[in-house]
Amino acid sequence: MTYKITSLAGDGIGPEIMTSGLQVLEAVAKKYNHTFEIESHPFGGAGIDVAQDPIPSSTLKACRDADAILLGAIGGPKWDNAPKRPEDGLLALRKALGLFANIRPIQVPSSITHLSPLKKEIVENTDFVVVRELTGGLYFGEPKYWDNEAAVDSLTYTRAEIERIIEKAFEIAATRNKKVTSVDKANVLASSKLWRKIADEVASRHPDITLEHLYVDAAAMLMIQRPTTFDVIVTENLFGDILSDEASVITGSLGMLPSASHAENGPSLYEPIHGSAPDIANQNIANPMSMISSVSMMLRQSFSLFEEADAIDAATARTMQAGFLTADLGGNTSTTDFTNEVLKQIEGGE
């Protein structure tokens, strides 16, 4: 079968790690007899450089026409004073494709507990997913303005927006340990009161899945104290932005974690959670694991190629266990050497 993928390498270390991800995809295609048609397009700062737009029209069309989208990283000080910033392109892409659900898996296998800033006994075997609503809340609410005397942001959520993200969380929980933690601030916010009510309604349709409610401050605390108690966390845009970044540092490095953004219909977007790291760009020292894991996530969630995704995950695990660690993990393995070992493991793996 042929799968059509749009590649958005972006800025900073994005092109380097995208090269790694596409090499892994090529190895999978060869081993399992698949065809992946890859179209590469400028995005973010690269889009500004070639078209004065972080998401050129040709890039957006390619994304709409794809079966899935891979994104490297965007941004950098070069575009700080540009009329349009690279990050504007990502917001526009999310809106254009209707990407409403961001999925961020957080895993700390026993082999990497020493990298975590938390004690081994706290983080060992941590395995949960943060499901963040992407299209509503304070980031998109109107009216929105500020001047020297006052500023206004608007927090608005509709029933439909809340219900679909909570249903997505329950859908994911059904494939895991059947527990959903809904995070809100229902003791203060009107939107959270509606959020909690709808969460209860959705839970009533899934009697085999446990629902618990936590205020966002309590959730932030428990994520550090007892991260292994979570299975699937679902929350609104602002809370999800903060909590997912907090969760990410539990592993010890942002360089290992992928994420996915899903629409109700159409292509999904897969990307590392880290930034463009312009300070280490073009030095062959960036950790490509999060990009490689994003490829695995794409194969699993967009194409249902579970065996192929498992092969990538096993290959990256064996690579790390063999001592191939990049600088962010305390080693000195280069981007290309890490990637080459993963390719070797895929080709020679079971």
From Swiss-Prot:
Q: Which cofactor does it need?
A: Mg(2+); Mn(2+)
Q: How is the cofactor bound?
A: Binds 1 Mg(2+) or Mn(2+) ion per subunit.
Which parts of the sequence bind NAD(+)?
76-87, 275-287
Listed binding positions for substrate are R94, R104, R132, D217
Tell me the subunit arrangement.
Homodimer.
Check the record and name the PANTHER family matching this protein. 3-ISOPROPYLMALATE DEHYDROGENASE
Keywords of this entry: Amino-acid biosynthesis, Branched-chain amino acid biosynthesis, Cytoplasm, Leucine biosynthesis, Magnesium, Manganese, Metal-binding, NAD, Oxidoreductase
Query: Where found in the cell?
Result: Cytoplasm
Q: What pathway is this protein said to act in by its record?
A: Amino-acid biosynthesis; L-leucine biosynthesis; L-leucine from 3-methyl-2-oxobutanoate: step 3/4
The gene it comes from is leuB
Mention one GO molecular function.
NAD binding
Binding-site list for Mg(2+): D217, D241, D245
* One GO term of the biological process aspect: L-leucine biosynthetic process
Gene3D superfamilies documented for this protein: Isopropylmalate Dehydrogenase
The molecule here is called: 3-isopropylmalate dehydrogenase
